[in-house]
Amino acid sequence: MLLKRLFNKQKIDNMDYESTLKNNWIKPFNKDISLLNISDTHGDLALNKEMQKKINNINYDLCCILGDIHDYDYKIILEKIPKEKIVAILGNHDRFSLLKEYGLDDFNGKVIDVNGIKIGAIQGSFKYKEEKFPSFTHEESINFLQMMPDVDILLSHDKPLTFDYRNPVHDGLKWITKFLYDRKVPINIHGHIHKSYLDELKNGTQVKDVYCIELIKIKKGKIVS
């Protein structure tokens, strides 16, 4: 009932969270990389042959799995993509043991260097219910991200919070936003929202929402497709 009331509440008194942050302009990394991103398939990949074709015979440097991927989908993914080319995090609908069951390392909180580009990640979503699932309160995400080294690209399941729309499931995490500002991160790639769009924060960070399967090409530190 609480969530229903929050969803139905009009979008009034919205807080512009970005306006509370010091506007540190991003540090561009001026390098190229192609990322195959998979997020929020929820079992659709195993049922959709056209979707499966998107991961056949394409060139990319790294496959980034951003969470909410069904078991059947993982079976398809691992038939087509070698594990050594995959980094994966959990979404809010994933069980904690999922990645281990499929022999994948949990990339949550880790950083990898690809083509001289540092890529890090944070799993899960804002903790909007009491049950245990991959999630953070705003306070927990503060402590988690403070321990992460500087990165050029931050992968996440949830989005950065920009406005408080009183929608705890999809508003995002404040401290993803603060991390992007404080560390001057040029790019954030996330899932969770079930839309595909490219946006930009006020400090210049490009924010790319991935839905299902998308190949993202980055040229000279900017997303171009």
Residue ranges and their predicted role:
Residues 42-49, 69-75, 92-99, 112-113, ...:
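Active-site environment of divalent metal-dependent phosphoester hydrolases
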Residues 1-78, 146-150, 155:
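N-terminal active-site segment of His-dependent metallophosphoesterases
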